[in-house]
């Protein structure tokens, strides 16, 4: 996967000191705007999951929707949206998670999966892992099987991937940015 990883990593714009001093923001819009880079990104995921008979791609609000919809289409899988609380119109399951200063919640329609469905959970980036971990709890409550948690970018210094692995989850990221 080095072919995909290096070219995608180079296409990601780093914005220093945004949204606050000391933060290096990883801007994925440059990947999305570059049709070759975006194709390579989706191909990286498709090559990984092709032939695994994935039933659904669960995509995390909001940038995960971009990657998740393209991946679901390519895998001939359904697309399930993991939304911020209050955004889904039908009966939902809700899971709270900790933020640096407070809590947040994600939700899922209670009929989003069938028990035993094979699911890939996708987002743009793994930082602390809180949102992804909350989403995995929702998916498991419905009885679906999480094949893997996947993202374009890993920020390993923030510990999210490690936290997800400690919960017994397989984690795949296309590229990572350490220490900066």
From Swiss-Prot:
<protein>
    <recommendedName>
        <fullName>Adenine phosphoribosyltransferase</fullName>
        <ecNumber>2.4.2.7</ecNumber>
    </recommendedName>
</protein>
<comment type="subunit">
    <text>Homodimer.</text>
</comment>
<comment type="similarity">
    <text>Belongs to the purine/pyrimidine phosphoribosyltransferase family.</text>
</comment>
<dbReference type="InterPro" id="IPR029057">
    <property type="entry name" value="PRTase-like"/>
</dbReference>
<dbReference type="GO" id="GO:0044209">
    <property type="term" value="P:AMP salvage"/>
</dbReference>
<dbReference type="GO" id="GO:0003999">
    <property type="term" value="F:adenine phosphoribosyltransferase activity"/>
</dbReference>
<dbReference type="InterPro" id="IPR005764">
    <property type="entry name" value="Ade_phspho_trans"/>
</dbReference>
<dbReference type="InterPro" id="IPR050120">
    <property type="entry name" value="Adenine_PRTase"/>
</dbReference>
<keyword id="KW-0808">Transferase</keyword>
<dbReference type="GO" id="GO:0006166">
    <property type="term" value="P:purine ribonucleoside salvage"/>
</dbReference>
<comment type="function">
    <text>Catalyzes a salvage reaction resulting in the formation of AMP, that is energically less costly than de novo synthesis.</text>
</comment>
<dbReference type="InterPro" id="IPR000836">
    <property type="entry name" value="PRibTrfase_dom"/>
</dbReference>
<keyword id="KW-0328">Glycosyltransferase</keyword>
<dbReference type="Pfam" id="PF00156">
    <property type="entry name" value="Pribosyltran"/>
</dbReference>
<dbReference type="GO" id="GO:0005737">
    <property type="term" value="C:cytoplasm"/>
</dbReference>
<keyword id="KW-0963">Cytoplasm</keyword>
<dbReference type="GO" id="GO:0006168">
    <property type="term" value="P:adenine salvage"/>
</dbReference>
<keyword id="KW-0660">Purine salvage</keyword>
<comment type="pathway">
    <text>Purine metabolism; AMP biosynthesis via salvage pathway; AMP from adenine: step 1/1.</text>
</comment>
